[in-house]
Amino acid sequence: MNALVVGATGLCGAAILKHAAEATSFNKVYALVRRQIPNSAARVETIVNEQSDSWPESVPAGVDVFFSGLGTTRANAGGLENQYKVDHDLNIAVAKAAKERGCRVCVIVSAIGASVNARLPYNKLKGDIERDLLALEFERTVILRPGVLLGERETHHKGFGNSVAVFLGKLVYRGRFQALLGYPVYGDEVGQVAVALALSDDKSKVRIVESAEILSLVKQENTQ
């Protein structure tokens, strides 16, 4: 079984790559990136393509599971339109290419509050991604909706609001007030659950996992 990871330099994508590389169920784990990344795992093969617009053409055949932790912020992208091109357009284009090459399972990191009817642009963006991803009709689709994401990022996410949310998220993590921030979760926990669910015996065509369940699944995984 082979896997493809996009967004492998981001917080959740890097965690997915790490856990997928550790999973003996995968023979090979491809990481589609714009620049070379350091990784000593024997089963990881990096596909470097600086032109992300042509990423769909770089998707290898023989991939069974498509993982995406691909995403950016409006500030980092330089506006909502550019953010949409990365978060939505690129995700869907690569997922479609993977599906056309025989991929059966799709696991993507979305966000809490994702909805096509959301008033907030970010939540609507994530809702649009989920809608169009489901339209591709993979045999199995897993959508993870984490709350505030915690952990060390390779690149800084601009924006005062994001910094405040992370600061508060660390304070309430797994505490009595965690629900107020949508159950903050570490990127590594998201990656762990993404890989575990991709390899699970769950036959559900669509599974949506909210942040509270991500935390619960991590606890279950770590006590086995």
From Swiss-Prot:
SUPFAM superfamilies: NAD(P)-binding Rossmann-fold domains. Keywords: Membrane, Mitochondrion, Mitochondrion outer membrane, Transit peptide. It is found in: Mitochondrion outer membrane. InterPro entries: NAD(P)-bd_dom, NAD(P)-bd_dom_sf. GO terms for biological process: import into nucleus. Residues 1-44 form a transit peptide. GO terms for cellular component: cytoplasm; mitochondrial outer membrane. Pfam families: NAD_binding_10. It is a peripheral membrane protein. Belongs to the FMP52 family. PANTHER family: OXIDOREDUCTASE HTATIP2. This is Protein FMP52, mitochondrial. It comes from Eremothecium gossypii (strain ATCC 10895 / CBS 109.51 / FGSC 9923 / NRRL Y-1056). The lineage of its organism: Eukaryota, Fungi, Dikarya, Ascomycota, Saccharomycotina.
